[in-house]
Amino acid sequence: WPSDKFMLGLVSFLIGHVFYISGLISGIEFSLSWQVWVPLIILGSGMFLGLRSGLGRMQLPVLLYILVILIMSGTAWERHFQLELPQTYFAVWGAALFILSDALLAWNRFRVKFKSAQLFILGTYYTAQWALAISLSQSAAEQVS
């Protein structure tokens, strides 16, 4: 195992986002509504361009990860717009907090280290996981009953 496990973590989280996409897309039609995807493309482009000079050999893996997390977020928004259920707000907030958590992590790793980074990264990360899990567990419970 390499001493720096960042790449292993990146791949693990990428796989996790694929599972979230699978859960979020169930029961809806995937669509490419511009209201969802144009802002996400702008956000993702800005994130990548802001990080690019510090990425070195990690440019392609980070770009792929950004694409997957944006697809997860877009799917959460599409779910919210199509189902209009209260729990879909949790999916949207969870996705937004996941993007924030990962942006803070990436900025801290590849650009500038900042004080209290772990507090902000983990605080947004755990809240994101909770919100996404709540949004999907409520949906699953309603589909069963």
Give residue ranges: language-model regions.
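Polytopic alpha-helical membrane-helix bundles and their juxtamembrane interface segments
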Residues: 1-145
